[in-house]
């Protein structure tokens, strides 16, 4: 929209971009709602959802009219006749004729001089939309990452508990098995070849694989995900990813 305006026939690239932007901005609110639903279903800490809510409120404060602008675009078959919901319904209920409602809530356009998008009486600033959208996107990502971080911590705890119950130490520096801390949101497991005699490696690897599998987890080779010889790969020093089955 801030670049060159390209005209193809009667169509302006800036006006097309304005429509796309309005719909995309409204979809961010839908994405936030979906994330909130997921956070509740997963039983996440309420602080995660609260932080996301605050980001959404700031987005709505920056773009209070975005819902109506988007509705006018996507429900044009109703808005063009004054039969839309929301503010158009309020106007009809107040006694305004549908054709007058349509007139007052129509005429979409982007004004490059003021850098604003308008739909009838509703408008939003493109300059304000960009940072607001960026912040809400970051907040949605942060909330999703919190879910991943919790899942990673749970997998790590399961793996360590399973190994401990099987009598396999994973405590550095003497433990024969290392379980990664999960900083990359993945859990990795490997045998410390330096502390395990060569003749004992395959037996230890099989014991580890059985313990992990028995805990409802699995070991996966990122080099060859379809590999069935997991114990052999572990015994040879390959680092494997721990996942839920």
Regions found by a protein language model. Name each.
Residues 45-46, 52, 184, 197, ...:
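Intrinsically disordered, low-complexity coil/linker segments enriched for acidic/polar
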Residues 32-43, 73, 77-80, 219:
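Amphipathic alpha-helical interaction segments
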Residues 210-244:
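A short amphipathic beta-strand at an alpha->beta junction
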Residues 2-15, 50-179, 187-188, 202, ...:
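Acidic, Ser/Thr/Gly/Pro-rich intrinsically disordered interaction regions
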Residues 5-50:
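Short, contiguous, well-structured surface segments enriched in hydrophobic/aromatic residues
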Residues 184-193:
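Short, aliphatic-rich beta-strand segments
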Residues 193-199:
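A short, exposed loop/beta-hairpin motif centered on an aromatic-Gly-Thr core
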